Amino acid sequence: MDASHTPHDITDRKNAIRSEMRTRLATLTADQRAEWSTAACARLIRSVAFARASRVMLYMPMRSEVDVISVALEAFRLGKSVCVPRVDGSRKTMSAVETTSFDDESMDSDSLGVRAPKVGQEILQEEIDLVIVPGVAFDMHGFRLGRGGGFYDRYLARFSRDTATIGVCFDIQFVEEIPTEPTDIAVHAVVSDRRAVQRDPSHALLAIQDRNHT
């Protein structure tokens, strides 16, 4: 945390960014969301992290988020295991649950109203090779701004460095700087519909095979 800013200042700045993102995202048409989601997912699928992962954790998209279901379907096609978050709002915890389908018969809603498998094996964090992370906003250093619950920060903090973490967003969700606190966790890379940004380009596992930006 920047010593020049109090926790209250940081909360105010985060809330201001959330408000700005709501305004930006509200302008998107369904066609734009679909087109930009397709572009971002194509970059994810081309990443070395995805190619090498045997088990991928990704989120169930909300209307304002990049739709990553095509990444899951490609993972299924390649024989990879897929898991998605299940949140326990009362305990403020997140776990990963394996899924093989996203149809209505297989899915339900967790305590926050986000789709999650009705049944499924809980996957230990050390068994996950790649985590695809949503966010309200990201900066070029890999810091993300979530919705304020802290679920992903607490969950990501327990991963080893060997697990690749990649944020995904629409390009309009990039900001110059996310105000941070000690509990905020940066992802290793961020992928949007227009670019791929790596916090540590020397880490081969996180290299993005980006044909449009060579």
Sequence positions of predicted segments:
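Conserved phosphate- and dinucleotide-binding cores of soluble alpha/beta proteins
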Residues: A3-S4, S90-T214
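N-terminal active-site beta-alpha-beta segment that forms phosphate/nucleotide-binding
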Residues: D2-E127
